[in-house]
């Protein structure tokens, strides 16, 4: 009996030890028992790209003196001179090696919880339900705007009334930059109505725009916002109406005489004064639609605002056969491009349009720069101008060299997951430890160039933040694992990247992500007459504003994510979305210049005096069909896009678990 008691005692002792270890390593992190990496170091531990790491930095007991995630460390010596494919060897970071997730309970919780939740088929019935929910979300917001706000620009969804420019406070740029007293929400939503197949409402809305909207207004608006929201929507709707194939149903307008195109031209002419009297060719940020550039206007503008006009202005020029609009937009892009750093190839985020001096030296992927990169690539896709692709490729390489942190590969190896940080444009040194919600567009852009693996990892990071808060805070500090700016104005960028990643991989994981986003929006932002901005992502208090991009982008991308049979996917026409989510068909018509030569003062030459080769439409077709993007590998369909250990690692790094 004694030996039985001894054996029983040993068994109980072993079970007790297992229980203690499980509490420490399993529950510990979720209960906050471990020391999170952001609290263990400060900015004084940052080193210059050429400086050695401090051998004593970092928490006591950490092997190798690792002080935190490799995001805080500059790229390895020589990284700025070599492409991303060169191996990076960052420190393991607080998240440790690749099998760290297993140590913290990955195997001990039975079948993997990520596999359980996300992998496998997404039932067709559930998909249809989510599609209808997305459509209902749009209809609820749109109908309430028409009932309570039209013809004003926006809907105040809590008090069920309209909102226009703030005439009492001209300095209220958050409102006045966007609202021009031209029924903004109605105009911005036109092509969403078409994509959802609502021909009767689309036709009614177009007639309302033609009959009631005028740009002869004493409104001072931001050139960028008026271009992407209004000009882009008018051009998109015009192309839908005049498309001989009518893939979305009968969207034709009886006796339509190109009125939307003429309205787009009228608006663009009113924006042209922004490009006059600037010593650099970079436009003023704002114009008055009646009088032109205000006399007391600011000479400083952001790179994205000045350099993201080429798609809309280029489409307008090519439809009208008038090179003026594309010329001024392209001149601005070239002027900004020529101001990039000679050392890093990076651009800043704020520039003086008269001196060309960089006022804001931060280089990142978020506010102030985001759509500049986006439109370099999309301009090439639409117009086939080779120089646009060359600029984009050079910019993308600089981004990889100086902004990207973390391990080399998304889905293998040790170290922290990839992240793109904000750096000084001249030195490449880290400037701060936050990212903003606009940066969530970048995985979608990476999909367009075929860098799907990196897109998967970056998207997973933003999705982890969404899971933690049920929204994306406007600015999130990855060092402190907390929001720096707490509001969420119903932005679409994460949804956009989710949609594009699903199109690239057909992985049901992204349908689950879309469902999470839909349910969060319904739970936290739906109010009496629409969907409201979240004032505070933690306490979920709301603000009385529904921005127009909620209907033009957020609802549209959610709907398309779940509508597998939508003509966007099945009609055989290739479509591209503008930075405001307006749909544009990619066809040879836009790749043919209706004028003899462009930039005539350059004589058809580049700055080096060499003749510029413009690929012909048939050459572009070969170039653009040479990738394997149309073939989805089976492993992308039936397994998680990111290994569970890396998903868990990312969730840990944002404080989710």
Swiss-Prot record:
Lumenal topological segments: 26-657
GO biological process: carbohydrate metabolic process; endoplasmic reticulum mannose trimming; ERAD pathway; mannoprotein catabolic process; positive regulation of retrograde protein transport, ER to cytosol; protein targeting to ER; response to unfolded protein; ubiquitin-dependent protein catabolic process
Variant or mutagenesis effect after changing residue 370 to N: Normal affinity for misfolded glycoproteins, but impaired SEL1L binding
The organism's place on the tree of life at top rank: Eukaryota
InterPro entries in the cross-refs: 6hp_glycosidase-like_sf, EDEM1/2/3, Glyco_hydro_47, Seven-hairpin_glycosidases
GO cellular component: aggresome; endoplasmic reticulum; endoplasmic reticulum membrane; endoplasmic reticulum quality control compartment
Keywords linked to the UniProt accession: Endoplasmic reticulum, Glycoprotein, Membrane, Signal-anchor, Transmembrane, Transmembrane helix, Unfolded protein response
Disordered: annotated span: 48-94
Keyword Heme included in the entry's annotation: no
Chief subcellular location: endoplasmic reticulum
Residues with attached carbohydrate: 181, 198, 299, 342, 624
Phenotypic consequence of residue 225 to Q: Normal affinity for misfolded glycoproteins, but impaired SEL1L binding
Places the protein is found: Endoplasmic reticulum membrane
GO MF term (any one): calcium ion binding
A Pfam entry, by short name: Glyco_hydro_47
Side Cytoplasmic, residues: 1-4
Transmembrane segments: 5-25
Topology with respect to the bilayer: Single-pass type II membrane protein
Similarity section: Belongs to the glycosyl hydrolase 47 family.
Record's function text: Extracts misfolded glycoproteins, but not glycoproteins undergoing productive folding, from the calnexin cycle. It is directly involved in endoplasmic reticulum-associated degradation (ERAD) and targets misfolded glycoproteins for degradation in an N-glycan-independent manner, probably by forming a complex with SEL1L. It has low mannosidase activity, catalyzing mannose trimming from Man8GlcNAc2 to Man7GlcNAc2.
Subunit structure: Interacts with DNAJC10. Interacts with DERL2 and DERL3. Binds to SEL1L.
Protein name according to UniProt: ER degradation-enhancing alpha-mannosidase-like protein 1
Organism: Homo sapiens (Human)
């Amino acid at each position: 009996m004694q030996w039985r008691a001894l054996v029983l005692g040993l068994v109980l002792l072993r079970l007790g030890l297992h229980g203690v270890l499980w509490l420490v390593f399993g529950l510990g992190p979720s209960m906050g028992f471990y020391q999170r990496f952001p609290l263990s170091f400060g900015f004084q531990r940052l080193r210059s790209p050429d400086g050695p790491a401090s051998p004593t930095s970092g928490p006591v007991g950490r092997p190798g003196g690792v002080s935190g995630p490799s995001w805080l460390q500059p790229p390895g010596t020589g990284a700025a001179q070599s492409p991303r494919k060169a191996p990076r060897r960052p420190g393991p970071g607080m998240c440790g090696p690749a099998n760290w997730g297993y140590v913290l309970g990955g195997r001990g919780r039975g079948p993997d919880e990520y596999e359980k939740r996300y992998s496998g088929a997404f039932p067709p019935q559930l998909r249809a339900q989510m599609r209808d929910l997305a459509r209902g979300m749009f209809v609820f917001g749109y109908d309430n705007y028409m009932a309570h706000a039209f013809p004003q620009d926006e809907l105040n969804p809590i008090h069920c009334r309209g909102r226009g420019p703030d005439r009492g406070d001209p300095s209220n740029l958050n409102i006045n930059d966007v609202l021009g007293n031209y029924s903004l929400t109605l105009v911005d939503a036109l092509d969403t109505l078409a994509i959802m197949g609502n021909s009767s409402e689309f036709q009614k809305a177009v007639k309302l725009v033609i009959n009631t909207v005028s740009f002869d207004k004493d409104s001072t608006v931001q050139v960028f916002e008026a271009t992407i929201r209004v000009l882009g929507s008018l051009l998109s709707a015009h192309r839908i109406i005049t498309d001989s194939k009518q893939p979305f149903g009968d969207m034709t307008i009886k006796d339509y005489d190109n009125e939307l195109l003429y309205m787009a031209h009228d608006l663009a002419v009113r924006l042209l004064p922004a490009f006059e009297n600037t010593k650099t060719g970079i436009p003023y940020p704002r114009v008055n639609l009646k009088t032109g550039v205000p006399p007391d206007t600011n000479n400083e503008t952001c790179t994205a605002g000045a350099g993201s006009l080429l798609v809309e202005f280029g489409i307008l020029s090519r439809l009208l056969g008038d090179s003026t609009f594309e010329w001024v937009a392209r001149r601005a892009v070239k002027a900004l491009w020529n101001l990039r750093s000679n050392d890093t190839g990076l651009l800043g985020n704020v520039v003086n349009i008269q001196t060309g001096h960089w006022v804001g030296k931060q280089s990142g992927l978020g506010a102030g720069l985001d759509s500049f990169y986006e439109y370099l690539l999309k301009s090439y896709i639409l117009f086939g101008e080779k120089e646009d692709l060359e600029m984009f490729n050079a910019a993308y390489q600089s981004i990889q060299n100086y902004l990207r942190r973390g391990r080399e590969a998304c889905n293998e190896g040790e170290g922290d997951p990839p992240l793109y940080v904000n750096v000084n444009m001249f030195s490449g040194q880290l400037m701060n430890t936050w990212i903003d919600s606009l940066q969530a567009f970048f995985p979608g852009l990476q999909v367009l160039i075929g860098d799907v693996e990196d897109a998967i990892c970056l998207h997973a990071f933003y999705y982890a933040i969404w899971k933690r808060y049920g929204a994306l805070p406007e600015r999130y500090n990855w060092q402190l694992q907390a929001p720096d700016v707490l509001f969420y104005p119903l932005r679409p960028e994460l949804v956009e990247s989710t949609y594009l990643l699903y199109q690239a991989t057909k992985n049901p994981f992204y349908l689950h992500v879309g469902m999470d986003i839909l349910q969060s929006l319904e739970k936290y932002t739906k109010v009496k007459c629409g969907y409201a901005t979240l004032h505070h992502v933690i306490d979920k208090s709301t603000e009385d504003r529904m921005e127009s991009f909620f209907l033009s982008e957020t609802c549209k991308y959610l709907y398309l994510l779940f509508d597998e049979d939508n003509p966007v996917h099945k009609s055989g026409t290739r479509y591209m979305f503008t930075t405001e989510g307006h749909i544009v068909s990619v066809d040879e018509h836009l790749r043919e210049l209706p004028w003899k030569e462009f930039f005539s003062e350059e004589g058809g030459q580049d700055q080096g005096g060499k003749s510029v080769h413009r690929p012909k439409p048939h050459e572009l077709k070969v170039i653009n069909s040479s990738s394997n993007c149309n073939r989805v590998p089976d492993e992308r369909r039936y397994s998680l896009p990111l290994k569970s250990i890396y998903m868990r690692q990312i969730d840990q790094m944002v404080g989710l678990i």
